[in-house]
């Protein structure tokens, strides 16, 4: 979101992407803190029972950004297409996927100290989805009224220099 904000055509979109991008950094901090608290006093047996022996082998009890399969985070997960409509739709999808992940975590969580902050993060993903929906609506209102499919209006303005 912080990368996409620089090419947003309006102040609302730039501010929204900036605010949500910064909030997402705080979400990462919350998740890292929860993981640190859960790992801090874990025994080797508990780490193995949780299926975290590969993580422990590589990182000890340090927090390292990776998915549930142990695949390290990479910027390949960050989408920025150069098309503001495509970016906002992608952002909406990302928020829905995060919300769904939190739904699944809540189904598994037995500890209220885990469930409560996850519930908060889930609620924020819903709000982000709604704000991105508003941004999409505003962008579409600014497009030519004949642009039914809400594609990037700048696409047809680009020169093809290879002809």
Residues of each region from the PLM?
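Non-heme di-metal
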Residues: 1-163
């Amino acid at each position: 979101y912080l990368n996409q904000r620089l090419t947003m055509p309006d102040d609302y979109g730039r501010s929204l992407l900036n605010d949500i991008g910064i909030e997402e950094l705080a979400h990462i901090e919350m998740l890292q803190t929860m993981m640190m608290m859960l790992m801090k006093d874990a025994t080797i047996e508990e780490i193995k029972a949780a299926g975290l022996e590969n993580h422990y082998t590589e990182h000890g009890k340090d927090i390292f950004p990776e998915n549930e399969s142990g695949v390290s985070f990479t910027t390949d997960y960050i989408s920025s297409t150069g098309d503001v409509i495509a970016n906002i739709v992608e952002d909406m999808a990302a928020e829905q996927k995060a919300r769904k992940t939190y739904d699944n975590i809540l189904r598994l969580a037995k500890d209220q100290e885990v469930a409560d902050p996850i519930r908060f993060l889930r609620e924020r993903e819903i709000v982000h989805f709604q704000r991105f929906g508003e941004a999409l609506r505003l962008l579409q209102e600014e497009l030519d009224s004949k642009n039914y499919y809400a594609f990037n209006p700048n696409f047809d303005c680009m020169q093809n220099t290879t002809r």
